[in-house]
């Protein structure tokens, strides 16, 4: 659904994370919210992909999440994919709407049902207090 192209431009800052396809299962259970992340400015997304998420960077709309559903055809079982350029900062994963978007995308991609209210992504205070880097290997 998307292609990596070097030197696409980069912007780090805050922007509302907007649902371009609110009816898509990835968008269930969360609404637009302010997100601080690193945004790639000119992503290359396939014509068949569905833009799902957008931010505004440097005053311009930027697609930061897209979905692709490959149709079933003779000899091919089809399949789903979700791509995003988000997720550069640990603090975003501490936010429930961000986690819900990611887990919804995983469920949808795996062909699982996404609940109407979105995936359950509740964490305890202890979970949220975990350090942002993995523990040293023994």
Range-by-range predicted roles:
Residues 19, 44-46, 68-77:
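Extracellular/periplasmic catalytic domains that process cell-envelope and extracellular macromolecules
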């Amino acid at each position: 659904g998307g292609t990596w192209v070097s030197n696409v431009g980069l912007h780090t800052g805050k922007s509302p994370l907007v649902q371009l396809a609110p009816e898509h299962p990835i968008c269930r259970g969360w609404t637009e919210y302010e997100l601080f992340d690193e945004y790639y400015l000119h992503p290359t997304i396939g014509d068949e992909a569905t833009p799902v998420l957008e931010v505004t960077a440097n005053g311009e709309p930027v697609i930061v999440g897209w979905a692709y559903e490959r149709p079933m055809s003779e000899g091919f079982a089809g399949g789903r994919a979700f791509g995003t350029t988000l997720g550069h900062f640990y603090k975003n994963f501490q936010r429930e709407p961000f986690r819900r978007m990611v887990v919804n995308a995983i469920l949808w991609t795996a062909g699982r049902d996404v609940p109407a209210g979105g995936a359950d992504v509740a964490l305890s205070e202890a979970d949220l207090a975990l350090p942002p880097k993995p523990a040293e290997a023994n």
